[in-house]
From Swiss-Prot:
Listed SMART domains: Enolase_C, Enolase_N
Family, similarity comment: Belongs to the enolase family.
Record text on cofactor binding: Binds a second Mg(2+) ion via substrate during catalysis.
Record field: catalytic activity: (2R)-2-phosphoglycerate = phosphoenolpyruvate + H2O
Record's keyword terms, sorted: Cell wall, Cytoplasm, Glycolysis, Lyase, Magnesium, Metal-binding, Secreted
A biological process from GO: glycolytic process
Domain of life from the UniProt record: Bacteria
InterPro entries attached to this UniProt entry: Enolase, Enolase-like_C_sf, Enolase-like_N, Enolase_C, Enolase_CS, Enolase_N
Protein name, as recorded: Enolase
Cofactor(s) in the UniProt record: Mg(2+)
GO cellular component, one term: peptidoglycan-based cell wall
């Protein structure tokens, strides 16, 4: 009754209006699962391959019909007949069927859509929530949200190099209250921006994208919004950055060239100067997390940054690790970073995603479950965050339904868990010296 009988993919649109995949899996019993695949704008060069058609006459070359066909004509034939509950066997079968180190043959987007749909179908077959199916009886930790309320870099047209300015409501007693803190700060920020005559249009991840005078202007404005909403920076709410440094790192000159986003007159920093600058910001403001502070291939820079700041700030590898256990293992061995960003489409299966989270935790690294800038209404990452007791999630600002869908799912999960639910706030940063 739990045997897979049909697998079907179709092309749908993501939050940027670009094509992506939706996959459906059916079993003999009638159990059903559906998975939708996100897409990134700033992508690490070592990520698994997102298969696009390249036909410029259709969606500007971004169509996903090849990936859809790979699901319907190749993957479906290979996994029909499997027990839907055997997630690892199905994921391994798809990896073997692809046969490349980066899933470049079938496409990570094709494989991931099936992987998610299989898990959802199994949960439906067992008549339990997805987080319970994935995590078992010890599932209880609601994640501390990283809320991206200012968008810069590749996620907006604002002249700021850093891609994300985030708030983290660590002082809230529950996830529900943490979400309220964030929403109130978001609206306070909007009022401040309007009062200054700045734009309140939002970027890809739902944050504002105003023309600030620079990074520190953005930080000071966020701090003012936190206080205007009635909260205390550095107690109720901390700050975080996603620098996305690979987006403005000049490989030939080996410098961090802020002029790419901030224009003529902006800083051009060496690796050592980049570390000094980040330390300066950390010493000045209540910053608890920095993502991709160094370029993805600047291993010496990452190690130096970790040695300098790794005891007091969470240093998250996104493009640096690309949710890949090979890169994470090297980082652990060399003492580079102290946290990994978990993006399911960077690696391509739920099995490999869970392996990366487990490896990080065993090494004392934190794991931050994350969305992509091109999202859908699929809320699987909310269930993954709770299933793994990851303790942190990054899923955008307090606007756009593609972001709110994840927050609303976490509210449902917190309700369903009842008294068992834990919101750990600052304790989610377990590898820092408070």
């Amino acid at each position: 009754m739990s045997i897979i009988t049909d697998v079907y993919a179709r092309e749908v649109l993501d939050s940027r209006g670009n094509p992506t995949l939706e996959v459906e899996v059916y079993t003999e019993s009638g159990a059903f699962g559906r998975g939708m695949v996100p897409s990134g704008a700033s992508t690490g060069e070592h990520e698994a391959v997102e298969l696009r058609d390249g036909d410029k006459s259709r969606y500007g070359g971004l169509g996903t019909q090849k990936a859809v066909d790979n699901v319907n004509n190749i993957i479906a034939e290979a996994i029909i007949g499997y027990d839907v509950r055997d997630q690892q066997a199905i994921d391994r079968a798809m990896i073997a069927l692809d046969g490349t180190p980066n899933k470049g043959k079938l496409g990570a987007n094709a494989i991931l859509g099936v992987s998610i749909a299989v898990a959802r179908a199994a949960a439906d077959y067992l008549e339990i929530p997805l987080y319970s199916y994935l995590g078992g009886f010890n599932t209880k930790v609601l994640p501390t949200p990283m809320m991206n309320i200012i968008n810069g870099g590749s996620h907006s047209d604002a002249p700021i190099a850093f891609q994300e300015f985030m708030i983290l409501p660590v002082g809230a007693p529950t996830f529900k209250e943490a979400l309220r803190y964030g929403a109130e700060i978001f609206h306070a920020l909007k009022k401040i921006l309007k009062s200054r005559g700045l734009e309140t249009a939002v970027g890809d991840e739902g944050g504002f994208a105003p023309r600030f005078e620079g990074t520190e202007d953005g930080v000071e404005t966020i701090l003012a919004a936190i206080e205007a909403a009635g909260y205390v920076p550095g107690k109720d709410v901390f700050l975080g950055f996603d620098c996305a440094s690979s987006e403005f790192y000049d490989k030939e000159r080996k410098v961090y060239d802020y002029t790419k986003f901030e224009g003529e007159g902006a800083a051009v920093r060496t690796s050592a100067e980049q570390i000094d600058y980040l330390e300066e910001l950390v010493n000045k403001y209540p910053i608890i997390t920095i993502e991709d502070g160094m370029d993805e291939n600047d291993w010496d820079g990452w190690k130096a940054l970790t040695e300098r700041l790794g005891k007091k700030v969470q240093l998250v590898g996104d493009d640096f690790f690309v949710t890949n256990t090979d890169y994470l293992a090297r980082g652990i061995q060399e003492g580079a970073a102290n946290s990994i960003l978990i993006k399911v489409n960077q690696i391509g299966t739920l099995t490999e995603t869970f392996e990366a989270i487990e490896m990080a935790k065993e090494a004392g690294y934190t794991a931050v479950v994350s969305h992509r800038s091109g999202e859908t209404e699929d809320s699987t990452i909310a269930d993954i965050a709770v299933a793994t007791n990851a303790g942190q999630i990054k899923t955008g600002s307090l606007s756009r339904t593609d972001r709110i869908a994840k927050y609303n799912q976490l509210l449902r999960i917190e309700d369903q868990l009842g008294e068992v639910a834990e919101y750990r706030g600052l304790k989610s940063f377990y590898n820092l010296k408070k």
